[in-house]
């Protein structure tokens, strides 16, 4: 199972729980999970992260961005299907509001059985149009999703994660 991360997962982790300079183990773990194809971030989502932000700077270090980048192109037909799940007649302002989220969802839709979206957006099923949350669009399209803490639990993150690796450096 590959978990596709929304940018807000990294932003919230850095701002609230695991600052890059205080909990480097978390950020090293993300790279490791990217290298083992358990966590990936579509290029459209990586592009949402500003280069001058702490996360943007971290992504530029070593091979961090390359380790996490999902190496495939979006299916534009699926992107259109996702956009229609927000509303069939979004205006230009609404397109700007939803940002790159339809790409994230489309990548998961391309392989529903093997992909789960990770987002910090809480479900709000009554919201409409561009205000819809990733989780609610995923529910409508039958795409798996979870929040950051569910991901951390399923993937068994601890700050001592390296000690769980076997003698060959593989988990």
Cite the ranges covered by each PLM segment.
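Active-site-proximal, substrate-binding regions of enzyme catalytic domains
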Residues: 3, 7-115, 123-124, 128
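Acidic, PIN/NYN-like endoribonuclease modules and their adjacent C-terminal/linker elements
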Residues: 2, 123-171
């Amino acid at each position: 199972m590959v978990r596709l991360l929304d940018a807000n997962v990294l932003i919230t982790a850095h701002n609230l729980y695991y600052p890059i300079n205080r909990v480097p183990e978390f950020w090293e773990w993300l790279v490791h999970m990217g290298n083992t194809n358990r966590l990936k971030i579509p290029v459209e989502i990586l592009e949402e992260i500003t280069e001058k932000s702490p996360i943007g700077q971290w992504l530029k270090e070593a091979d961090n961005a390359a380790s996490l980048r999902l190496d495939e192109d979006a299916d534009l037909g699926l992107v259109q299907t996702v956009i229609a799940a927000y509303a069939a007649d979004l205006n230009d302002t609404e397109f700007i509001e939803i940002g790159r989220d339809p790409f994230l969802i489309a990548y998961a839709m391309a392989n529903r059985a093997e992909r789960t979206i990770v987002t910090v957006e809480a479900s709000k099923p009554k919201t409409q149009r561009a205000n819809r949350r990733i989780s609610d669009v995923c529910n409508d399209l039958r795409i798996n999703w979870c929040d950051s803490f569910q991901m951390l639990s399923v993937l068994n993150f601890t700050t001592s994660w390296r000690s769980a690796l076997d003698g060959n450096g593989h988990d």
